[in-house]
Amino acid sequence: MRERLLAAEKVKSIEWHGDRLSLLDQRKLPTEEVWHSCDSAAAVADAIRDMVVRGAPAIGISAAYALVLAARTRMAAGGDWRQALEEDVALLAASRPTAVNLFWALNQMRERLERLKPGEDPCAALEAQAISIHESDREANLAMAQFGVDLIRRHQGNPQNLLTHCNTGALATGGFGTALGVIRAAHLDGLVERVYVDETRPWLQGSRLTAWELLGDGVPATLNVDSAAAHLMKSRGISWVIVGADRITANGDVANKIGTYQLAVLAMHHGVRFMVVAPSSTIDMALESGDEILLEERAGSELLEVNGQRFAAEIEVFNPVFDVTPADLIDAIVTEKGVVERPNAAKMTELMNRKRLH
């Protein structure tokens, strides 16, 4: 499976050039493929906030490279560069508050600085750590894909109809995807009849990004409006809903793109299995439950403007980016460390105590 997945890898969204970071501008896809160049931590923070780059793993990787750029700038300026670097950490941390991979990556970079040996070049050490974070995410994608395919096959070995939400592919990670990586692997193994893709309003990550990735891979796919999910489950024989995650708490609650919670409720009602796929860096054991997660909200203009024209300008807007799916609605959480079925606090603790695969 590993070799087949690597051979099928086509899309990259993050490229490190040593002195700058290039990000495939996801606001312009699929009509334009434009690379956005960042030469400072502030530029990367803006790119994260403005959705040039999105997806929890990709955000974390980008932030790691941003600290390399920041360290070089701070050291060149002289003075207490470590203290000054904390300003860059804070700037990056504030760019997307829900994605725990962002904070995980920043902590990994901080810890690397704390382990510096006498005479060791801090910038070189940080660069090596950022590259390691990037490469580790790719390896995690491979492991999750295999675990996810094994889970699908164990429940039903014939080609199946799957439903996914938002974008969890190569555009959202350092490899070829979390949930979409499992779907890609399932397709290579002959387990996919068709993938139904939620459009995912208001940024349309499903219709702009996931559909683009699936079509590029030759995976049979159908785009649907978000509100068709219940009808699809009832009429199209959906066997799995497969989604990613931006944060998973110690009890197995999952914060993900808005609309995920309602998919889980609908899946439970229709007897459809619900799988969450995310690296262990997405799991925040410091939070007991999803009630403690800070859920980002974005500007109301995202709902009030169509083709540059503003409608119902005076109405109040509620535009949350994420919601929380309770653990008791989830059949399985798939990570690079293994699979937790019917997650709870004890099972999540056992998972996180396992040795890392990379």
From Swiss-Prot:
It comes from the Bacteria. It is an enzyme of class 5 (isomerase). GO terms for molecular function: S-methyl-5-thioribose-1-phosphate isomerase activity. Keywords: Amino-acid biosynthesis, Isomerase, Methionine biosynthesis. The active site is at 246 (proton donor). Pathway: Amino-acid biosynthesis; L-methionine biosynthesis via salvage pathway; L-methionine from S-methyl-5-thio-alpha-D-ribose 1-phosphate: step 1/6. The keyword Isomerase applies. The keyword Acetylation does not apply. The record marks 166 as: Transition state stabilizer. It catalyses: 5-(methylsulfanyl)-alpha-D-ribose 1-phosphate = 5-(methylsulfanyl)-D-ribulose 1-phosphate. Substrate binds at residues 54-56, 96, 205, 256-257. Its EC number is 5.3.1.23. GO terms for biological process: L-methionine salvage from methylthioadenosine. Belongs to the eIF-2B alpha/beta/delta subunits family. MtnA subfamily. Catalyzes the interconversion of methylthioribose-1-phosphate (MTR-1-P) into methylthioribulose-1-phosphate (MTRu-1-P). This is Methylthioribose-1-phosphate isomerase. The lineage of its organism: Bacteria, Pseudomonadati, Pseudomonadota, Gammaproteobacteria, Pseudomonadales.
